[in-house]
Amino acid sequence: MKKDEFELLDPIQSQKKPFLVCCVEEPSAREMLLGVLPRLGLREWEDFQIMVFQGKQDLEKRLELRLRAWQRPQSVFLILRDQDSGDCKAVKQGLFWKLMASGQTGLVRIACRELESFYLGDLQAVANALAIPALAQYQNSQKFRGPDNLNNAKQELQKLTGFHYQEVSGSRQIAALLSLSLDPPINRSHSFQALLQGILQLLAQGEK
């Protein structure tokens, strides 16, 4: 696996399982992770914790301070933010600098361009979660073959579901059913695949 330039991983692996701390900008991202992490064998509070910031500006402003103040040993950090209209590399670089300045171990992942791109990458999960079976057939359409390229993924998902998708409750329903397969990858969102790979990298910090 190619190493990401925005990763700070400890080359000296310990025998103790790391504690994963996820830093996210909004409650919907928390719900997404709560649907994914337990299926990777992690238990909230015992194996992981999610810090929810009050939007992007709050994340950018307070991230370094929160990371510096963190005291739990053997912790590794996952920082997740939407790209939105920003330059992906610039957004990632800015967060990486804050991680580096804090002295903590971890990595940065960006949802290209919005969290909903993860869901548009697995329309079968959306169809099952929202009980709209016909949705799955749209996965091979040109628009949804590469959901990371959509500038308005949230709006697209709302229209596609007849506005049945709501950010927090929809994330809770859909994330629990998202495919976590990486070999072969099922989800068409490359940024979701990168997120899963990053989580597995962080967890591997505690393996011999």
Regions found by a protein language model. Name each.
Residues M1-L20, R30-M51, Q57-K208:
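C-terminal accessory helical subdomains adjacent to catalytic cores in phosphodiester-
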